[in-house]
Amino acid sequence: MFGGLKNFIKEKSEALAGIHRESDESCGFRVLKVENDSKAYNARIESYYDFITAVNGILLNGDPSMFMALLRDSSPEVTLEVFSLKGQITRKVNIKINSDEKIGMVLQWASIAPAVDAIWHILNVIDDSPVARASLVPYEDYIVGTPEGMMTGEKALSDLIESHLNRPLRLYIYNHYRDSTRQVTIVPNRHWGGNGAIGCGVGHGVLHRLPAPLSGPPPQPGDIVFSNPMLGGPDHKVSQPSETENFLPTPEPPKIASANAGSSNEISIPHYQRHKKSHKGAIQDSSIQSYLDEEEKLSRELDHKTKDASSTNDSQTTPLPPPPPVAVNSTNDESAPQNEELVKN
């Protein structure tokens, strides 16, 4: 049994390893630069974060001549499948081009998996640390690269910091909430007054990959977070009450429709005043008392009519006939003919 279980685990491990190898071998043309006001720029293709993996549904194999041929044959419109490191999603981008027109971007064939893994999330930041002096924002900023060279592997950042102790280190920082990338310079130092060389916690792995960008930056102090469309937009001004308006007057009682009203269909609700109870169960409203008396009178009249109708029906109804006599057997000769006559009738 244990031998079969061992073989099963071995097969599953090999299958999972094959899946990981296939995912690691996924590649595409990485966008290194996008020219301003170009076709790629207007199509919102981002440098550093985007990989072109297919053209018109045809997967690319890293051959630049194949890529250029597909672009020439796609006139007047080409569809690019673009993989983004932000959220690890693939989108389709349509670009209208001519056969001899340039898209306006610089590409390099590269593997996607190492780029997805080369992300470090800035967690807690200690005050007066090298990272705090560089104005890094905790839980919003991500280290995505450096001009010093490629960063691959989980220990790439720590090795880079160790090699730049007491020296300026340039880093590319991506802010998730503002969807912007900036370059900062920090000086790693183990004698700045706290733990570590840069003074912050760093997260790495699947849980700390680049998320998809938000629709906009987070609200700042004084910004309108929620608005009521009934107020006419954010420019609507609310008047401030004066000191005399802080106390509201007593509102008028509401009005209800009356079914018995003649010329007017509205009557005001009567105001009741609290009095001492004269006896238990006393009714304060005369209109309610008259209504109850009228209902009691109608109930008595209806009950009286019902009794009269039942007595009349009893007098006019024909009584039921009595049951027939029961024949009795006897040895007396005089009663025998009478019994026989009753049976014949």
UniProtKB/Swiss-Prot annotation:
Keywords: Golgi apparatus, Membrane, Repeat. Residues 297-308 have a biased composition (Basic and acidic residues). One of its GO terms (cellular component) is cell tip. One of its GO terms (biological process) is Golgi organization. Coiled coil: none annotated. Residues 27-223 are annotated as: GRASP. Residues 229-345 are annotated as: Disordered. Pfam families: GRASP55_65. Residues 309-318, 328-338 have a biased composition (Polar residues). Residues 27-112, 118-207 form the PDZ GRASP-type domain. This is Uncharacterized protein C1D4.02c. It comes from Schizosaccharomyces pombe (strain 972 / ATCC 24843) (Fission yeast).
